[in-house]
């Protein structure tokens, strides 16, 4: 199976979601699947051949931490090109409604999509303001996973 995985957080910094994505990709490889990963990363960051950089990220204070995300028209084009080139049987997006490359990939996705949610949080003004944009995106998900 051809599997595309999208990580919203930059591979320039170490974090739990990045580790989860890399461990998942490694296990899927071991099980015989073809895997490609798309994530923010600077040009200086060494990446495995199967990881594609979505471009540089910016640091944004979020949920008591700092999230290194990327977004915008250029990132959206990179995500579409990656999706087209990958011709994935399934797409697995981590934090699919976080404003980063994952959200852009979800907008462009045409096949089955699994969304994994890593962060639990109380209601927030940001989530409330983004709700009109995120509800249609949530409906595109074929399956949802919550990490405990």
What are these regions (language model features)?
Residues 61-90, 100, 129-136:
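An amphipathic, basic-hydrophobic alpha-helix
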Residues 16-27, 101, 130:
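Conserved alpha-helical elements of sugar-nucleotide-dependent glycosyltransferases
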Residues 110-112, 141-142:
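A short helix->loop->beta-strand "cap" motif at the edges of active sites that frequently abuts
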Residues 1-3:
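Extreme N-terminal starter segment of soluble prokaryotic enzymes
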Residues 7-12, 22, 26-74:
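N-terminal strand-loop element at the rim of the active site
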Residues 121, 127-146:
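Membrane-proximal helix-turn-helix segments that form the acceptor-binding/catalytic region
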Residues 8, 94-95, 117-121:
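Histidine-centered beta-alpha loop that forms part of the nucleotide-sugar donor binding/catalytic region
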